[in-house]
């Protein structure tokens, strides 16, 4: 969204400027027992090197990020978020190591060393962990490290809610596209209700504005599902955080009646999911029109079941079309009064 490379300091600064809950950071253990924050390729390589075979200096010498930044370490990222007034956490994604073959010991090393650094820097309130679920030993080891460091930990796996509870994990992190079910716009079999029933908090990645990420959903129906249910999720991850925050703010904003054409448009949009228009109600339970408005390109509103108090004002509507569609509401099962149209 901001054009910064993944896992860059610029991306972190952007997330912090928006007041995001957190930024996901991919982490790997290095040969010199440090942790780099980097997005590896399909061969688990960063700058054409597998991180666990190289030192931080060697990885940095092999190349920079596309914006010219030096490859960052976890310590540098922690130092940046531990500042007065910042609310953005680092959500450390302990990446699987499966190239050229599965090597869970390096996943365990990454979880262990990351938690040690967090403890050394007294940063437990600024960091959370997500561990890959591909290897049971790595998963259990990461969980133990996180518990000792007092850092929240989730698992990235489409296991059932019941399995999460059995393994001691209270937080699941799933792909929106392949993990979540059709009701959420995905192709998987996991549902929000299943995890709620099991007492497991649920995060998903990603809810996006457009196609481009294989784990993302971006259809209007899917986006609307997550917006309608976002308070039931632990976190929603997105490659377009400013866009998603704006969508959520718009959907949950509480209005003082209708005072502008923009307010009226928001009211009309809200009726699709809430025919009472509750976000626009005053203390008497009415939607009050506070000024005369001229509406162009008007489409009759969805079913309205509340009370629309025109407050003696006038709606002037520019309309051309089927005479059967003329009217303020397609269906009115409530009351409209004190209004001139």
What role is predicted for each listed range?
Residues 1-253:
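Phosphate-group recognition and catalysis centered on beta-loop-alpha active-site segments
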Residues 250-341:
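Surface-exposed repetitive/solenoidal architectures
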